[in-house]
């Protein structure tokens, strides 16, 4: 695997991190958090590479033995922890391995680096087990915790990390990169809007299969306005894509609320859906949209933590609630 570079919009953050490292002031634990698609994984990978590199400059040299091992996909002084395949939670056994790992001497004589991603996936037992290592990390140990939603982490874990928040990105800061990825300024700006200022997510959403899903969800909502049965529309949607469906629904509800409160189309992240929004705003009340937004966020949270709600029932209940408001 090639060593990852820092995204253009994170250069200032990167320079701050490298100054800490070069000055011997790097904390033993970093919590890098931001919404999916902001680029935190790229920042973390660049930091991992530079920390393990034998001859770092602004970034890892890419040529030393340590960099070569990392590029090959294995480094003895790097431990990655994430949910097992098919699982949503990080359980205690991988964290016990972390505790063993930090008690050993680095094989390359430098840092030992532990990456936990997504950190909010740790269950309570795993998080409590990690606390011991965070409290007594030993010399030349760096923990990098990555999180989309740090509020779902134990407060005691957060308090033992230096937090680095990566907010959504202004268009001008990522314009050139997005045009390079998507081919035109119009496409770049549209998908940047849809993604809420998250450049990597914008590229994901612009992919053909994601465009098709967005179109299908939009069509289902149009059908609901015309009187279609919510259960029938739920059956048309792919329940395996429930997280994406709820994500779109949340984004569209947030648009509806912005429009309902301001009346201005300029506030929309999905300007192409303005006709649907106008119809919905005409029929529903803002407080009703807030209640539906809370419901959608809670269902998505339950899915994320592995509570295993029935996806088909969630879809049906979700669209029944939408239909009731669209026709009220």
Describe each region flagged by the PLM.
Residues 2-125:
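Clamp-loader machinery-focused feature within the broader ASCE/P-loop NTPase space
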Residues 100, 132, 155, 159:
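Conserved adenine-binding aromatic site and its adjacent loop/helix in ATP-hydrolyzing domains
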Residues 85, 134, 209:
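A short beta-strand motif that forms part of the nucleic acid-binding face
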Residues 1-50, 69, 139-142, 148-328:
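Charged, glycine-rich active-site and insertion segments that engage polyanionic ligands
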Residues 117-123, 128-135, 151:
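Catalytic acidic motif of RecA-like/P-loop NTPases
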Residues 103, 128-145:
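Conserved catalytic/switch belt of AAA+ P-loop NTPases
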């Amino acid at each position: 695997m090639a060593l990852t570079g820092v995204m253009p919009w994170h250069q200032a953050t990167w320079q701050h991190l490298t100054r800490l490292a070069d000055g011997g002031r790097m904390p033993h634990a970093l919590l890098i958090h931001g919404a999916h698609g902001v680029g935190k994984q790229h920042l973390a990978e660049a930091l991992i590479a530079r920390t393990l590199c034998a001859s770092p400059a602004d970034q890892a040299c890419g040529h030393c033995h340590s960099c070569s091992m990392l590029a090959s996909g294995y480094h003895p002084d790097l431990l990655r922890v994430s949910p097992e395949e098919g699982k949503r939670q990080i359980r205690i056994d991988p964290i016990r391995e972390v505790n063993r790992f930090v008690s050993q001497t680095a094989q390359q004589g430098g840092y030992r680096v532990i990456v936990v991603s997504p950190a909010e996936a740790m269950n309570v037992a795993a998080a409590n087990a990690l606390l011991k290592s965070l409290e007594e990390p030993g010399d030349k140990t760096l923990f990098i915790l990555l999180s989309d939603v740090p509020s779902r982490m134990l407060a005691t874990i957060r308090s033992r990390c230096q937090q680095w928040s990566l907010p959504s990105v202004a268009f001008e800061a990522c314009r050139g990169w997005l045009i390079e990825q998507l081919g035109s300024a119009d496409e770049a700006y549209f998908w940047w809007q849809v993604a809420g200022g998250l450049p990597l997510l914008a590229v994901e959403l612009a992919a053909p299969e994601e465009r098709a899903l967005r179109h299908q969800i939009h069509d289902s909502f149009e059908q609901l306005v015309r009187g279609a049965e919510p259960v029938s529309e739920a059956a048309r949607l792919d329940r395996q894509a429930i997280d994406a469906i709820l994500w779109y629904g949340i984004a569209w509800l947030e648009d509806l609320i912005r429009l309902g409160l301001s009346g201005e189309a300029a506030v929309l992240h999905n300007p192409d859906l303005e006709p649907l929004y106008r119809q919905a705003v005409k029929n529903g009340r803002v407080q009703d949209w807030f209640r539906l937004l809370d419901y959608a966020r809670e269902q998505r949270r339950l899915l994320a933590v592995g509570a295993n709600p029935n996806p088909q029932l969630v879809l049906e209940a979700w669209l029944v609630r939408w239909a009731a408001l669209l026709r009220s």
